[in-house]
Regions:
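Conserved N-terminal alpha-helix of the aminotransferase class I/II PLP-enzyme fold
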Residues: 64-97
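A glycine-/small-polar-enriched, mobile loop at the entrance of the PLP active site in fold-type I
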Residues: 37-40, 55-73
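Generic structural signal for well-ordered alpha-helical scaffold segments
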Residues: 24, 78, 82, 108-109
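Substrate/cofactor-recognition hotspot
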Residues: 8
Length: 398
């Protein structure tokens, strides 16, 4: 008897979680590791949100809720879309799930079949291709270029479209690059989605974490026709430092949301009741802490980009949003340390961890090998020391 399914055997653990686990294991041994691997804000959840959760507990709001979320939270999400994006939705067009990843997974299971193709620009968030594959569809990877700000061009997108194209995955601002699409960029994607009849899955989880006065535009807001073809994947995790609360949400066509609700009813059922109440406060309560977090992230971004670009042989694109940089280390490929040659980003990441005691995530996991992802969701002190360690380690490569 075969123990594991082919589906299970086809999967590997999330590389970002694996890197963090290795770094924590070293730290447990007393080794001082500086981690740039985190995919979550280093700030605490704002106090008003925590108090809303405490109130929910004290009032006994600890039972099952409707599968797709409580009406109060759906209304808060609807209010958020109207306020921030000039988008109008009904409760039946909103689904609350156990995090943004769960939202994407539900969506993939609801709309993809064997033979469908899903266009994913690279660099991409590590979980997109596996979740598409788990739904028996084929991820079609389209490479982007550093000189274009890691954004897919209309020409490259057009080349990837076939009669089997079911959806295009848009992540703006992006994990891992921090690139963000302007309204003008999005209008070109809209034209192709409508003319070639495919869905746009818009992951907007980093919407509020943007810099230099960038104006975020939700692609669904551009016209009614594209809104019908767009499914927005969102959540409270990044904006409100609520990664552990596990609340994501989806907005889209009623038929799709209903199917996702059915899938969720047979898997997790409802998201945590207490987290739902906290998320209501996050979305409709005061937003003071968000601005403070973004301001701190922007200061860190400015420092880390400037510092990386001063390291010989390293180039770092300046991100527009999120809290990651994606520097290019290709000039160090082919060099060696103690007989071991660096010929890909995985070996370089291992080198940084073993020699510099710095954890980064190899770019190959995001579909872009010459790069490493560094999160600046950590203290300025750690950023300074971590980059000093990286620079010193690189000097040892010959």
């Amino acid at each position: 008897m075969t123990v594991l399914s082919n589906r299970a055997k086809s999967l590997k653990p999330s590389p970002t979680l694996a890197i963090n686990a290795k770094a924590k294991s070293m730290q447990a041994q007393g080794i001082h590791v500086i981690s740039f691997g985190a995919g979550e804000p280093d700030f605490d959840t704002p106090q008003n949100i925590k108090l809303a959760a405490v109130k929910a507990i004290e009032e006994g709001f600890t039972k099952y809720t409707p599968v797709g979320g409580i009406d109060e939270l759906k209304d808060a999400i609807i209010q958020k879309f109207q306020r921030d994006n000039n988008l109008t939705y009904k409760r039946s067009q909103i689904l609350v799930s156990c995090g943004g990843k769960h939202s994407f997974y539900n969506l993939a299971q609801a709309i993809f079949d064997q033979g469908d193709e899903v266009i994913i620009p690279a660099p991409y968030w590590v979980s997109y291709p596996p979740m598409v594959a788990l739904a028996d569809a084929s991820p079609i990877i389209v490479e982007t270029r550093e000189e274009n700000g890691f954004k897919v061009t209309p020409e490259d997108l057009k080349k990837a479209i076939t009669p089997k194209t079911k959806a295009f995955v848009l992540n703006s601002p992006s994990n891992p690059t921090g690139s963000a699409y302007t309204k003008e960029d999005l209008e070109k994607i809209v034209e192709m989605a409508i003319s070639h009849n495919f869905f746009v899955i818009s992951d907007e989880i980093y919407e509020k974490i943007v810099y230099d006065g960038f104006k975020f535009t939700s692609i669904a807001s551009l016209n009614e026709e594209i809104k019908k073809r767009t499914i927005i994947v969102h959540g409270v995790a990044k904006t409100y430092a609520m990664t552990g609360w596990r609340i994501g949400y989806t907005a889209g066509p009623e038929e799709i949301i209903s199917a996702m609700n059915n899938i969720q009813s047979q898997s997790t059922s409802n998201p945590t009741s207490i987290s739902q109440k906290a998320s209501v406060e996050a979305l409709i309560g005061h937003q003071d802490e968000v601005g403070k977090m973004v301001s701190a992230f922007e200061q860190r971004r400015n420092y880390i980009v400037d510092r990386l670009n001063k390291i010989e042989g390293v180039f770092c694109y300046k991100p527009t949003g999120a809290f990651y940089v994606f520097p290019n280390f290709s000039s160090y490929f082919g060099k060696s340390y103690q007989g071991k040659t660096i010929f890909n980003s995985t070996i370089l990441a291992d080198f940084f961890l073993d020699v510099a005691r710095v954890a980064v995530v190899p770019g190959v996991e995001f579909g872009a090998d010459p790069f490493e992802r560094l999160s600046y969701a950590t203290s300025m002190e750690d950023i300074r020391e971590g980059l000093d360690r990286i620079e010193e380690a690189l000097k040892k490569l010959v």
